[in-house]
């Protein structure tokens, strides 16, 4: 976590104030400031503590099942007839997605800080499930805030959370999606600062959350880099990941940022198209503003009011993005592109039929970008796609959209 970086590196952020260039920071209520500073101090101490690292490593290995595999998607690659596509199989982790990586790190932090109550927000339910899972593992009560719309479209995950002992609180404000759930979680945190740890699920929020979530998720890219060198004897030409808040993406991207030969592509939710407001492509169609404690690219109207946005994928249905992604966009290191709902649905089906792997709708956005890019590349080229989660949670949504009666 603490390797020295070159002065011209893309890995130098954030600074002491939590800024990545003009993005990031700590825009929070005064009551939260002492807690934020306490968390920052606890994290600085923990990441330099060999015992903390050893405990996290043991849990990652024996509980979560790391390292996750880097799998050559031969069927999909041959179908597309271009670059060799590899999947980083985060769907094989305990709880079915990349979310467990961050939750294990943060629950250990909460323990060190003496917190006795866990709160979390969730969109697709994967972070809620992972939070409820680690809370159950360590015997702590867990409250998960989830938009009412998402509660409806992610019923299997709602049941899993309840089964794990968590209390799921539906949020009906706004569109009843991830932004609204995060608002409620922040309100809870402000009123319960003494005993409560807010386990944020994405690489956004006030500093130090974007940094610590990135660090806990960077295991994805660290492993993928080593695995591709073992399997191909070289670095990939392209790496691709879906971006909602951006934790799975920054986890894959960060270890590759200083590899100039590697093209990096983040895939946003283009929804029903960028012309109207039915999308969540904050970097393709938004502008900088402040939300949930940090300055970043946001979907907002002319008055600066945050728009609701839309995506077929509950996990990408967020009108902002982590501040490090905003900085990487402006610095030109990472390309961010939108994928439409129907393109993601097509990729969902194509992956299932060519690979026998049902991907999460979030991951299907990244696969859809691979479907566009791979045929334009030579067969000697190599691409890694982050398969951030499995699609069991999405089969009802997809079934309904395809006109099937499930």
UniProtKB/Swiss-Prot annotation:
Provide one Gene Ontology cellular component: cytoplasm
Q: Which residues carry this modification: N6-(pyridoxal phosphate)lysine?
A: 99
Q: Name one GO molecular function term.
A: tryptophan synthase activity
Please state what class of enzyme this protein is: lyase
What's its EC?
4.2.1.20
Family matches, as PROSITE patterns: TRP_SYNTHASE_BETA
UniProt pathway annotation: Amino-acid biosynthesis; L-tryptophan biosynthesis; L-tryptophan from chorismate: step 5/5
Keywords for this protein: Amino-acid biosynthesis, Aromatic amino acid biosynthesis, Lyase, Pyridoxal phosphate, Tryptophan biosynthesis
Cofactor(s) this protein cannot do without: pyridoxal 5'-phosphate
Domain of life according to the entry: Bacteria
Q: What Gene3D superfamilies does UniProt report for this protein, alphabetically?
A: 3.40.50.1100
* Reaction catalysis annotation: (1S,2R)-1-C-(indol-3-yl)glycerol 3-phosphate + L-serine = D-glyceraldehyde 3-phosphate + L-tryptophan + H2O
InterPro entries on file: Trp_synth_b_CS, Trp_synth_beta, Trp_synth_beta/beta-like, TrpB-like_PALP, TrpB-like_PALP_sf
Record text on subunit structure and interactions: Tetramer of two alpha and two beta chains.
Function, as annotated = The beta subunit is responsible for the synthesis of L-tryptophan from indole and L-serine.
Q: What family is this?
A: Belongs to the TrpB family.
HAMAP family the UniProt entry points to? Trp_synth_beta
The protein in question is named Tryptophan synthase beta chain
The gene that this protein is the product of is trpB
